[in-house]
Regions:
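N-terminal leader/linker segments that initiate helical-solenoid repeat arrays
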Residues: 1-81, 90-96, 303, 309
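Solenoid-like repeat scaffolds
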Residues: 8-14, 46-52, 84-90, 119-127, ...
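Generic helix N-cap/helix-start motif at coil->alpha-helix transitions
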Residues: 15-24, 53-60, 90-99, 125-135, ...
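Residue at a conserved register position within TPR or TPR-like alpha-solenoid repeats
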Residues: 29, 67, 105, 140, ...
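C-terminal soluble interaction/assembly domains
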Residues: 243-246, 250-314
Length: 314
């Protein structure tokens, strides 16, 4: 059995002799992908005086699957709920149905219902698998109970340090709970272990660093990502380089501001980064370079050409 510690006594799952034909007919409809037929057969079977708990639970769970195949998630949840209430399936099937119900409730954004279902599932099965606990954390996050969600994720990540999906969901929950330093720490540890291999993952870390005003670390992550080919040159990366440049400028770090604008400008969608580069170079007394950047800004297109022309006229 999948749930050896379950508190529920697994019933003897047997069809009543009087309903076997109906169940077989239902199975045939299912195999023909006649989902509506399966559902009406399940309703019919559920109303039979001769149907036992197993018959009803089996029929309703099949109707739930049929509804899910029709993309009618609300109906699927109704039938999976009826299957659980009929209480006639063996433990493995009963709890698989209950878990399915929780997943559908979550997908339908019925987070309170999903939480009640998953809590019942965990209490009765005494199962504590990482994916089940992570699902519960996701439900809590859906209810904006981010502190509780974050605590579960942190515990799970400690036990499963190489599970990247767990990590990114945990980071999202921590950010939702406004625990930004904790989120950064998780990302940092994963980064040091070489786990962050996709642009959005690296971006989560360097944007986290930017928000924490840890500019040099942010720059290192960006540069490393570009060197490894994870971050591709383009408008989005240009935007992030410009944020680094603006911050360097605000902190009177002219050399860094110039370096970051120089990286942003060629890959930006328009000439605004070149214009900003020209302004910073001009303020830094680098007139010839400023003029070259202003010319590039005009070539690429900017909102206020007069700003570039002013630098060129000096």
């Amino acid at each position: 059995p999948m749930y050896p510690n379950a508190t529920r006594q697994s019933p003897e799952a047997k069809a009543s002799p009087k309903t076997i034909k109906s169940l077989q007919a239902m199975q045939e409809l299912y195999e023909k992908d006649d989902w509506a037929g399966v559902i009406s057969k399940a309703d019919e079977l559920g109303g039979m005086a001769s149907a036992n708990a197993y018959d009803k639970a089996f029929a309703y769970s099949m109707a739930g699957n049929a509804a899910a195949n029709m993309n009618d998630q609300a109906k699927a949840a109704t039938y999976f709920g009826k299957a659980v209430d009929a209480n006639g399936l063996d433990n493995d099937s009963h709890y698989a149905t209950m878990y399915n119900l929780a997943i559908i409730q979550y997908g339908e954004e019925k987070y309170a219902d999903a939480l009640a279902t998953i809590d019942r599932f965990l209490a009765e099965t005494k199962s504590g698998k990482a994916d089940q606990l992570a699902f519960r954390a996701g439900v809590l996050a859906g209810l904006n109970r981010n502190d509780e969600a974050a605590a579960i994720y942190k515990d799970l990540i400690n036990k499963n340090p190489t599970d990247k999906r767990l990590l990114m969901n945990g980071v999202a929950a921590l950010q939702g709970a406004e625990k930004f330093d904790d989120a950064n720490k998780l990302l940092e540890q994963a980064y040091q272990r070489g786990m962050l291999t996709e642009p959005r993952e690296l971006r989560a870390l360097y944007i986290g660093y930017m928000n924490a005003q840890r500019w040099t670390e942010a720059q290192k992550v960006v540069d490393d990502g570009v060197a490894k080919g994870i971050l591709q040159p383009g408008p989005e990366l240009a935007r992030d380089y410009q944020i680094l440049a603006q911050t360097a400028y605000a902190n009177d770090n002219m050399p860094l501001a110039i370096a970051m604008y120089k990286r942003a400008a060629p890959m930006a969608a328009d000439g605004e980064a070149y214009l900003n580069l020209a302004k910073v170079l001009d303020m830094d007394g680098k007139k010839a370079e400023a003029k070259a950047a202003a010319k590039s800004a005009l070539d690429k297109g900017i909102k206020k050409p007069e700003d570039a022309k002013r630098i060129l006229a000096r």
